[in-house]
Amino acid sequence: MKRLFVDLDICNKCEECKVCCSYFYHPQNNGIASVREYATFATICRHCEEAPCVNSCYHNALERASDGHIKRYKMRCTSCKSCSVACPFGIIFQDFIPYLDSRCDYCIGQSGKLPKCVTSCPEKALDIKEIEEDLEKNIYFVGEYLAVHTRKWSKEDMQVKKK
């Protein structure tokens, strides 16, 4: 199955995102922002046991999901940035927490045509392709339609380094 592939290592180096989106219901949509947030929370967030970001949110917009990951309820979020300030690792970037939410539908159903985000990314950080999850190459599946290349943080990595 083809997936939207995002190379966060390339994407995060870009100084000014020029990616366009063709999301039908909202032409001013910035779908890549929601994809980057989703991928970052799933692969880079440290998922702290105490989770200061969750405790700092006055609107209960963040919570720990049953799988241990931190989840943001976008309709509760007022973009106050308290989670960003509280994150001890600086993982929650303030520009990832917009008040107005954008959506990505991964352009499901656009067969034979590349999504506008892929064709408009000047750094080639996005692609649609058949790809296998490969932990040794830092390629992770996030959800059903997204594959991400990034350095994933894990508690196991830190325990190995301490020894």
At which residue positions do the language-model features occur?
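Short glycine/acidic-rich loop motifs that flank beta-strands on beta-rich extracellular proteins
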Residues: 66-68
